[in-house]
């Protein structure tokens, strides 16, 4: 049995949905440079720095993937949603319970949840808005 690469799995999911690159960018709130970076990823660590957990979670939510498929996709980039991390729990909740939510609405919810907690919003917000500061795995 061969293991799919991140790109194989992602573009298979996109193809199954029949979405164009423009539709993916809009649904996942990704700018073109970010999506281009995703398209040209390889499996080395150096290619990961622009594709953070927030960007990957935005793909999962924007594409309305279930939690099982989302976790598989995240794992292919070396990420996992920790049950001990409140931000990861919020992401998990959005994936599991808020199917069809827009990334803008998800970001609004995240902002409300973490306002006043001392969390740096650029490290929480999804899509191209959340990649500037990087992310912890």
Per-region residue spans from a language model:
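A short, Lys/Arg-rich alpha-helix, primarily the initiator
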Residues: 1-23, 27, 102-136
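Short acidic alpha-helix initiation/capping motifs at coil-to-helix transition points
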Residues: 2-4, 13-15, 47-55, 82-87
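Key DNA-contact positions within bacterial/archaeal DNA-binding proteins
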Residues: 22, 33-36, 68
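Recognition helix of helix-turn-helix/homeodomain-like DNA-binding domains
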Residues: 29-51, 75-78
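DNA major-groove recognition helix of helix-turn-helix/homeodomain DNA-binding modules
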Residues: 51-69
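Long, compositionally biased
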Residues: 61-63, 87-116
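Short, charged recognition helix plus adjacent turn
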Residues: 71-99, 121-125
